[in-house]
Regions:
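Juxtacatalytic substrate-recognition/specificity segment
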Residues: 207-235
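Hydrophobic core residues within well-ordered beta-strands of beta-rich domains
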Residues: 40-44, 103
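A surface-exposed beta-strand-loop module
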Residues: 57, 64-125, 179-186
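N-terminal, polar/Ser/Thr-rich
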Residues: 1-41
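Extended, low-hydrophobicity, Ser/Thr/Pro/Gly-biased non-transmembrane segments
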Residues: 1-15, 45, 108-200
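Short structured motifs
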Residues: 25-33, 89-94, 138-143, 170-173
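Short coil-to-beta strand junction motifs in C2/discoidin
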Residues: 61-66, 150-152
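Ligand-binding face of N-terminal immunoglobulin V-set domains in extracellular IgSF glycoproteins
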Residues: 43-64
Length: 235
């Protein structure tokens, strides 16, 4: 059940004041969806620079369907809290980071992704045929930490059934970096943003030539016979 503020003009999270003297230099995510149960488990790491000489409270947007655990700064457990207030299917996770200049913030998360409008086109789904993880559903999203000089460079890894292909909604392509004995593969891609969108599915890929360009055209394998009969790749 979605408990987000019904006022769609609310922007409490979007208008948070950024912390002065705190920046994110890099982040990484390792996420493993369970396509049979419809759940997600993941770990996230944020390389933060704190030049204030004081403890700071970092805010992240989290999916309310997830449980947050094992929150650490430079390997030491730190206090955290998750707000009851929700906005656009996000709750606010607040974490106290130490006064040290270089801080590696790590955390674990897991549970059921939720969404505010399940009937909208392109809505989130998590199955062996298709999944879409957006922003906080993919990993907790920094809300009050500004990017470093290089932006928000991020490495995303996701482990899925071998039949699924990963398509990130960004400029880079995902590549397989490991194949496991349990019939899964780990994909990796680089991006540069605080959030992100990831699609994956049991896809068939066709190359289409158009205007001197080669375009990758993907469609679900269950539609392969229909698409081939219709000559979709030649259309």
């Amino acid at each position: 059940i979605d408990h987000s503020n019904p006022d769609l003009s609310a922007m409490t999270f979007l208008t948070m004041e950024p912390l002065e003297g705190v920046a994110c230099l890099r982040r990484s995510v390792q996420v493993t969806p369970d396509t049979r149960r419809g759940t997600v488990e993941g770990t996230a790491s944020y390389q933060l620079q704190n030049t204030t000489g004081q403890e700071q409270t970092v805010a992240l947007g989290v999916t309310p369907g997830y449980t947050i655990s094992n929150v650490r700064a430079n390997g030491v457990e730190v206090p955290f809290s998750v707000s009851d207030y929700q906005e656009y299917n996000e709750a606010k996770l607040e974490v106290a980071i130490p006064a040290e200049e270089q801080v590696e913030l790590t955390l674990e998360y897991g549970g059921f992704p939720q969404e505010s409008m399940p009937t909208m086109q392109g809505s989130k789904e998590l199955s062996g045929e298709y999944l879409c993880l957006e922003n906080a559903a993919l990993s907790p999203r920094l809300m009050n930490v500004m990017p470093g000089e290089d932006g928000y460079p991020a490495t995303i890894e996701i482990t899925l059934p071998a039949a699924m292909t990963v398509i990130p909604f960004c400029a880079s392509e995902a590549e397989v970096v490991a194949e496991h004995g349990d019939g899964t593969k780990t994909w990796r891609y680089e991006t540069n943003r605080a959030g992100g969108i990831l699609y994956a599915g049991d896809y068939v890929r066709e190359e289409i030539q158009a205007g001197g360009l080669t375009i990758d055209f993907y469609y679900g394998r269950k539609h392969q016979a229909v698409m081939e009969a219709a000559g979709a790749a030649e259309a």
